[in-house]
């Protein structure tokens, strides 16, 4: 019984420690944090939300399920190379970017989405909806379908 109680306590503290590790990281003059896979991570991101002016959310189109391991590239409106590149370990990303217009590309399962957003004093929320499977007909190009099938 003591072993089970100790294991449960250690698991609870491990989850809390993981949530506390989420903090804003710096890259190319932008600060960002991604996560939200569990309750603790979502709470940690909620505490960081006031620091962000871009909020990204990655979901499945049909069911609205959360996605993780999404490749994200943020481009300033006048740039051809990304000012920020990250892999979102969870369904949410918070970004503190200099004021301006941005193009944000997200790639998941071979499907790529590109949306525009303006970073101002008020946060802009950008939702990327991906098909359950890239070949299920939700805006997946023939190239995306072939790539997802491994051809």
Where are these predicted regions, by residue range?
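Short, surface-exposed beta-strand/beta-hairpin micro-motifs centered on an aromatic residue
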Residues: 90-96
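Short amphipathic beta-strand segments in non-cytosolic proteins
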Residues: 71-83
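N-terminal signal peptide c-region/cleavage motif recognized by signal peptidases
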Residues: 12-18
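A short tyrosine-centered beta-strand micro-motif
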Residues: 100-106
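Cleavable N-terminal signal peptides
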Residues: 6-7, 17
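Positively charged n-region of N-terminal signal peptides that target proteins for export
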Residues: 1-4
């Amino acid at each position: 019984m003591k072993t089970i109680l100790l294991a449960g306590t250690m698991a609870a503290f491990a989850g809390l420690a993981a949530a506390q590790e989420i903090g804003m990281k710096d890259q190319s003059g932008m600060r960002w944090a991604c996560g939200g896979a569990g309750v603790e991570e979502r709470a940690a991101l909620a505490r960081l939300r006031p620091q962000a002016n871009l909020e990204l959310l990655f979901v499945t189109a049909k069911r609205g399920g959360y996605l993780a391991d999404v490749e994200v590239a943020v481009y300033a409106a006048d740039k051809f190379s990304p000012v920020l590149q990250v892999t979102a370990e969870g369904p949410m990303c918070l970004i503190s970017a200099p004021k301006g217009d941005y193009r944000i590309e997200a790639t998941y399962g071979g499907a790529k989405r590109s949306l525009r957003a303006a970073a101002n004093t008020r946060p802009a929320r950008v939702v990327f909806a991906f098909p359950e499977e890239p070949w299920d007909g939700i805006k997946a190009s023939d190239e995306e379908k072939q790539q997802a099938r491994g051809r």
